[in-house]
Amino acid sequence: MIGALARRLFGSPNDRRIKGYQPRVAAINALEPEVAALSDEALRARTVDFRAQIAAGATLDDILVPAFATVREAAKRTLGQRHFDVQLIGGMVLHEGDIAEMKTGEGKTLVATLAVYLNALAGKGVHVVTVNDYLAKRDSAWMGEIYTFLGMTTGVIVHGLSDAERKAAYGCDITYGTNNEYGFDYLRDNMKYTLEEMVQRGHAYAIVDEVDSILIDEARTPLIISGPLDDRSEFYNTIDTFLPKLDKATDFEVDEKQRTVTLTEVGMETIEVLLRDAGQLKGESLYDIENVSVVHHINQALRAHSLFQRDKDYIVRNDEVIIIDEFTGRMMPGRRYSEGLHQALEAKEHVTVQPENQTLASITFQNYFRMYDKLAGMTGTALTEADELFDIYKLEVVEIPTNVPIARLDEDDEVYRTQNEKYAAILAEVERANSRLQPVLVGTASIEKSEVLADYLKNNGYKQIDFADPKGMEKLYAAARAGKPAKLFAVLNARFHEQEAYIVAEAGVPGAITIATNMAGRGTDIKLGGSLEMRIEHETVDITDEAEKAAKIELIKADVERFRELVLRAEETIEIEPAKGAKPAKTLTRPGGLYIIGSERHESRRIDNQLRGRSGRQGDPGRSKFFLSLEDDLMRIFGSDRLDTMLTKLGLKEGEAIIHPWINKALEKAQQKVEARNFDIRKNLLKFDNVSNDQRKVIFDQRIDLMQDESVAETVSDMRHIFVEDLVAKHVPEHAYAEQWDVAGLKEELNRVLGLDLPVEEWAKEEGIAEEELLSRIENRADEHMAAKVAQWGPEMMRYAEKSILLQTLDHLWREHLVMLDHLRNVIGLRGYGQRDPLQEYKSEAFNLFEALIAHLREAVTAQLMRVEIVTQEPQPELPPMAAHKFDPQTGEDELAFASVALAPADDADKAARDPNRPETWGKVGRNEDCPCNSGKKYKHCHGRYA
């Protein structure tokens, strides 16, 4: 209450911040006549002048006012659009590294140009992040006109580009691309072996469009690059032949309850002998560093034979091992056990051993975007998540006033008892709206729910069409011109592509009915009457005669204007029956415009607000209403069964709805609870992610330092000395007598790792020799050995070998370390049962693993360099084959499973050789690529359906 009073007296913090921008807005407006009087050349020259000022010591804040005035004038001359005052404020918020919340249709894309231009003047590159390739290409071409006019370069990063094309795009002043592409390029860059191969040039400033979607909804979605391990089928089969030779009584112990198998001391000796005889043992001991993967696969083979039973845990069919679900008993084709277990089962059953994959690199969006020196974002709905955005990213959400007041009517929810009653009510509402040609967008929470609604419409005489199909749209246009409902509808789900943007843009045509899942077509405005630009682009593409084209454009313009008027007039007038003895009936008019119908509330208020926000752009009229049932997920979570009992007692009849503002408030409180819980989960998971992220940054930064150094001789020398120090300390304890030294063990290790046969026993027998003297002699011999190699092969060749071995070994051990961290993450929660904090335990264990990684790196690099034999024309180290993965947090589906997002994209020459009429010339086509037949459809929706 006191807070509300204070806000009335002094304004909210948001109001005060908006007010603080007004002096600079006034200054920009005052400059407008002066800038407008400049010639194109003089306006373009201001970019050079601004850069000179920055070079002389001026800050970006110092030149903000003239820079914004320059961009506004350039936009007027190139696009015919002028930034409103509220858009100038939005640009300032973005420049300050915060989030500008701007309602649908307020011109977020244009707003970004202000902050993008200003920050690009610094010369460090600006990244604009979009949610899909279509928007990246659209916005870079559209807004690129402004930047090009002002003498700046613009690049775009989309799927399928070569490394050279990517590097050129990142080298531009401004780069547009998707969050996926930026993240994968970062991961790939940190797997390259030279700086010249890297495509990104740093992370100075990024503006994230639809920031709530990327930084919250997809925050925990990891981007993963995996690669197949070498074909080791022979190795698995060899290991499998050892198992019958082991004695269960003496060689291993099985714990069926814990589902573990452990080798005994006797078993280890038996396995060592078998491995040595088969030529599979590296070094002397099974547990040497080189044999880590061998031990792992032996354990997996033991598990396959001892814990997994054929026809209970799996079946064998068509040369495949197929897992059986332990709960349902159903086969799960396509599912595979990880970490080599499935390969061990295949070897056990003597079927073809399929290759396994290994995670080569991964990062979450949370950790990727926090690398930027300055991060900003735009969205229509972020205020409800303001706490999380500030807590995790230190981004404040600033609500930007609309240029024109919102005229949308948001009605109270209608709550029904069952799903069937709810869908019947939605159908009736859609039919009423369609009868007056009011366009309707029905929002659903899932593809499954959208199909249910589609079936309801089909069963009631409606026909499903594709709004991207010109013939289907012409039926809709013809019906609208005749003033009759066409009874046509389209269904969209969240798979972004150009056709989808067109469908969404046409959802404002009179009589259009569109069923869409949450994110479908986000980033594309729904204009009343349809999109003039989209229609001109699609309907004139095949017209070559200029006069015919101009005539067609005029017809389209007349169509869109007439359609807009029809939609604006699609109001609903309702007569309210008077109470007994009252005055005659009153009428209630509900506005026309786009009618948003929500088929259920989502866990997040923000998603509901996004749906409502599709209507009422730039002061247009519109309506929104949610239809709910007590069987909806959110209602069930919060005790709809008790409410159902109460409504039954109150005599609520079938088909009747409850409508009351209290219901809305109760639902909002329920949503707030779910949001708070989800925030806590994300925050807790981030704490775990931070541990591996800190280690990733150390490794990646170290890699770049190594690549920057002309020579890593000093680094490998230090590693060799530290390794020898640790080795001597292990066998020659400090302050111990010479008789207590493990001289034989030290000699053996020096021979095994360094390949040096040193007279350690003789040195140890010398009178008065101390451990320091022993250490010094060993280091000197090791240094002499390396100096001899340098003399033999030459400094240049040796420097190359040192860097190659160091980088390749680091990469190999880092990948193994990632696997270990994954294993640790999966089991660390069990420590909670022992009254230990899993997070602290994870930090401690992960640190120990990281220390072990560094120690293994020293040993492995030292061992390889001491034994290295260089051949002439040493080949450049090659990166392993890679595949990119991004798992949908809702479905668990790999969104990139069928996309060709490998390190080396498809060769442009191969694509150029494709004949649209001859599928045999197409080669391998990614399922999400455009179909080579030039239909405009994705391959998976065209010829790929039959592949």
From Swiss-Prot:
Residues 907-937 are annotated as: Disordered. May bind 1 zinc ion per subunit. Its cofactor is Zn(2+). Zn(2+) binds at residues 931, 933, 942-943. Part of the Sec protein translocase complex. Interacts with the SecYEG preprotein conducting channel. Has a central role in coupling the hydrolysis of ATP to the transfer of proteins into and across the cell membrane, serving both as a receptor for the preprotein-SecB complex and as an ATP-driven molecular motor driving the stepwise translocation of polypeptide chains across the membrane. Belongs to the SecA family. This is Protein translocase subunit SecA 1. It comes from Rhodopseudomonas palustris (strain BisA53). The gene is secA1.
